[in-house]
UniProtKB/Swiss-Prot annotation:
Subcellular location: Plastid, Chloroplast thylakoid membrane
Family of this protein: Belongs to the phycobiliprotein family.
Descriptive protein name: R-phycoerythrin alpha chain
Cited InterPro entries: Globin-like_sf (IPR009050), Phycobilisome_asu/bsu (IPR012128), Phycobilisome_asu/bsu_sf (IPR038719)
Organism: Agarophyton chilense (Red seaweed)
UniProt: (2R,3E)-phycoerythrobilin 1 binding residues: 81-82, 84, 88
Domain of life the protein comes from: Eukaryota
Main location: plastid
Protein's job: Light-harvesting photosynthetic tetrapyrrole chromophore-protein from the phycobiliprotein complex.
Length: 164
């Protein structure tokens, strides 16, 4: 799984060298942010059901037409699948926060997502709206510390930009 540390080590090994000073600075920065990332991961894990529900509700609130016949949320089963997908992505955000890299999102969430959603007639804009709502809803210090919020928002921005 890709993280800052595994990326640095892989690059150095591929080049047949030891990690450079800038490589080690990158690892050090990643380690310094670990506490904030773990705080964000813990807060997300302890509140994930509410986060997923609010994100899904925001998605269907903004794109109400999705519940029309022939659309992605035309029945309860399909609506539940949308919430399930949001939950899946939020777990991947959690995993990414824990490891300090985008590996889980890249490997298990984003690769091919646009093509799959297009094939299934699922608009990525609805998922983007759900993740943007979740990012914008964050309120420090109510939800988490400012630095943890930055780490959390950065992970959500990564999903949003990848699906855009």
């Amino acid at each position: 799984m890709k993280s800052v540390i595994t990326t640095v080590i892989s690059a150095a090994d591929s080049a047949g060298r030891f990690p450079s000073s800038s490589d080690l600075e990158s690892v050090q920065g990643n380690i310094q942010r670990a506490s904030a990332r773990l705080e964000a991961a813990e807060k997300l894990a302890s509140n994930h059901e509410a986060v997923v529900k609010e994100a899904g509700d925001a998605c269907f609130g903004k794109y109400g037409y999705l519940k029309n016949p022939g659309e992605a949320g035309e029945n309860q089963e399909k609506i539940n699948k949308c919430y399930r997908d949001i939950d899946h992505y939020m777990r991947l955000v959690n995993y990414s926060l824990v490891i300090g890299g985008t590996g889980p999102l890249d490997e298990w969430g984003i690769a091919g997502a646009r093509e799959v959603y297009r094939t299934l007639n699922l608009p990525t804009s609805a998922y983007i709206a759900a993740f943007a709502f979740t990012r914008d809803r964050l309120c420090g210090p109510r939800d988490m510390s400012a630095q943890a919020g930055v780490e959390y928002s950065t992970a959500l921005d990564y999903i949003i930009n990848s699906l855009s």
